[in-house]
Amino acid sequence: MTQAPRIQLLSPRLANQIAAGEVVERPASVIKELLENSLDSGAGRIEVDVEQGGVKLLRVRDDGCGIPPDDLPLALARHATSKIRDLEDLERVMSLGFRGEALASISSVSRLTLTSRTADASEAWQVETEGREMEARVQPAAHPVGTSVEVRDLFFNTPARRKFLRTEKTEFDHLQEVIKRLALARFDVAFHLRHNGKGVLALHQANDDSARARRVAAVCGPAFLEQALPIEIERNGLRLWGWVGLPTFSRSQADLQYFYVNGRMVRDKLVAHAVRQAYRDVLFNGRHPTFVLFLDVDPAVVDVNVHPTKHEVRFRDSRMVHDFLYGTLHRALGDVRPEDQLAAPASVAPMTQVSGLAAGEFAGQNEMSLSASVLERPQGETPAWRGAGAGYQAPRPASAGYTAEAQGAYREFFTPLPESAAAPLPASQDDVPPLGYALAQLKGVYILAENAQGMVLVDMHAAHERITYERLKTAMASEGLRGQPLLVPESIALSQREADCAEEHAQWFQMLGFELQRLGPETLAIRQIPSLLKQAEATQLVRDVLADLLEYGTSDRIQAHLNELLATMACHGAVRANRRLTLPEMNALLRDMEHTERSGQCNHGRPTWTQLGMDDLDKLFLRGR
């Protein structure tokens, strides 16, 4: 009979290396922990030196408060920290680090040197470790006020971990991404990065709106900021601010999404779900939204101690946070009008587009020129074109057919029109509506219009589809949902937790046209469904809705099914291709687009219009060269 192994304490070295497996995955993980310590120290400037993607050397130097010499050995001990003292501090954490594990874990898999000096000290002190259990030796050193941490030969004593590292470029790319995220979290701190002795990043302190906008443009690319909506709203103790990209500036990957809670970068499924809902019917299938958002909340209502790398958080009232995020973003996107999209040409950024750090855009950050609309969105009076489109009467174009008298027609083309036949011109540029006035129809599919910026091209079917869709949604919201009783109620077997959830949300289901009855601890009866969803699989829909309610505290599946049905109705009811429209009909469509929510995209997320400015047209014909 095999003897059972005895329980014994692990050695400090092995315990630290096990902890390092959670905290230290690659050089980017190390730089994250070191930068967070620098930010917590009150640093205003941080310098990072990297060699061989961070495997050979990682050095972080800051001008923070420094560490007293007596505390230096403790800084490398496990569970030793200056940031919390008791449980009450843990429940209201505002610092980025608080566990006291990072330096101990890093030092167990590398050769680490920590040098620091406080403002009241006459000299700096230094402590070193070499990835093994040893007595930390403190010695004097030369160093300005602040702290430097030098990490050499990462994973030198754990070769198995080192084998999992990627190429130097890949590891450095991950490291850059961490610095990008932290640079957006702290506009008041300057960041400088060098790789193999070459300067890569130079971000100066950004203490005003224009400087912050330049930093966002440097990190995310100028195109993002030109096509992003600045938002700021505060309600019920929650404050959300930042920039959300227009639906026309989407990505094929979720690589331009930055979200922060109290200055801490997080990747949270609740946040992702709320954002996905807000962009639901304005993004083309497979595309991802872009955003840089900051959520400020009372630290007591958010738990940051739920993940080894602190990437996830848990909110005390997750449903309130979810609804706040969704409602704010949904309204911001719904309020977008064509004039908001004219700051820059609409575009869909391809996955291969290089911007930010990879493109070296930081070097000229201070000289970066951004349009005034990016730095400060005007809040003027309602322009004169609002509501004025109905009175516009443009002349009917002559027939486009060719005749035998081509030469005569060609000469007649250059004959000036009589003054009475000319189209009425606006008194000033301010009187021109954002989408301008229609000029002609192309192949029965596109509308050509002229506005103050140049030429506008409109996909008339896509535009009319969105207008019809929004009207159907408004009508349904005002008239309510009609329920249709089932002749034979459907029985559905659930877990007791799901059945309890259905009973708790019975009134909510009723508002959406469902009537559910509890038959037993794990059984429900569906007695009524929305009349619009009579063809839907009611049992599976209820199951999916309950799963969402248990996961997120809310669900939009019923509304999504209804919207999908309305979108189909709008698609079939919209004006078809090859239908000839008169100029007044085209102008009426343009005016409707200017007053309709989300008119920049059809129900499937495709763009409904695009702008070709005079500069774009001049480039096509090589004018000005």
Curated annotation (Swiss-Prot):
Pfam families: DNA_mis_repair (PF01119), HATPase_c_3 (PF13589), MutL_C (PF08676). GO terms for cellular component: mismatch repair complex. One of its GO terms (biological process) is mismatch repair. PROSITE patterns: DNA_MISMATCH_REPAIR_1. InterPro entries: DNA_mismatch_repair_CS, DNA_mismatch_repair_MutL, DNA_mismatch_S5_2-like, HATPase_C_sf, MutL/Mlh/PMS, MutL/Mlh/Pms-like, MutL_C, MutL_C_dimsub. Transmembrane segments: none annotated. GO terms for molecular function: ATP binding; ATP hydrolysis activity; ATP-dependent DNA damage sensor activity; mismatched DNA binding. Keywords: DNA damage, DNA repair. It comes from the Bacteria. Belongs to the DNA mismatch repair MutL/HexB family. This protein is involved in the repair of mismatches in DNA. It is required for dam-dependent methyl-directed DNA mismatch repair. May act as a 'molecular matchmaker', a protein that promotes the formation of a stable complex between two or more DNA-binding proteins in an ATP-dependent manner without itself being part of a final effector complex. NCBIfam families: mutl, PRK00095.1-2. This is DNA mismatch repair protein MutL.
